[in-house]
Amino acid sequence: MRFACFVVLCFSGFAVAADVKSGPQVGSTLPGPFEPLNLNGPDAGDECCLFCKYGNSPVVMVFASKPSEKLYKLVGELEKAATAATGEVGACLVVTDPSAGAQKALKTFADDAKLKATIVGVIAAEKQKDYELAKDAEVTVLIYSKRVVRINHAFKSGELTDKAIAAVTADAAKHYSGK
C-alpha cells in the first residue's frame, strides 16, 4: 500500500538555501502530531494527522507560507517521485495560510494536477509552533524516515528556483529508493 503526504523533500544533509534555518534540523526527531485540514485524498475535508498516517515510512513533507506557482511545480515533481516509489512512502504539502482563498487555490491545484500520492492541507501557523518554522522561510522541506529528519531544505521568498526544485526532487527520489 502506498501512502501519501506531501511536502514534505536525501542524504546530502544540507539546506540548499543555507542562510535560513527552518524546522527540525538533520538528525533531530520530529516534534510529533499535528492535524491540518486535508484538501484532497481519502481524508479530504477532515483534519487528519499526516505525521501519524505515515508512521515510519520515508516521507517528504513540505511546509509553505502561501501557495505559489513555484510551489506547485515542486509539488508536481514530488508527486512524480512518490508515485515512482516501489514501497510505502508519504508526500504532503502543508500551507500555513488557512484562509478561504488559499484553500480554494490549493484545492484547485490538487484537482487540476490530479494528485494521487500527495496530500495537500492547510493549518494555522500557530498550530505548528513545535516545528519551529522560520518566519522568513517561505518553504521548508523535511525529508524524513522513522520520524528522524534526514534532509532539511529551507527557502526564503524567491529562492525556490528551478535548480532548487531539481535538488529537492533528487533528494526525495533517493530517499524514497532507500539510497
PLM region descriptions:
Residues 47-72, 89-92:
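Short active-site neighborhood of thiol/selenol oxidoreductases, capturing the structured segment around
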Residues 19-48, 69:
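N-terminal "domain-start" segment that seeds a small globular fold
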Residues 67-110:
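Structural microenvironment flanking redox-active thiols in thiol-disulfide oxidoreductases
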Residues 55-60, 86-91, 115-118, 138, ...:
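Loop/turn elements at helix/coil->beta-strand transitions in domains of secreted/extracellular proteins
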Residues 54-56, 125-165:
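Thiol/disulfide oxidoreductase modules built on the thioredoxin-like
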Residues 8-17:
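Hydrophobic h-region of N-terminal signal peptides that target proteins for export
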Residues 109-134:
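Short, internal strand/loop/helix patches
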Residues 1-4:
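Positively charged n-region of N-terminal signal peptides that target proteins for export
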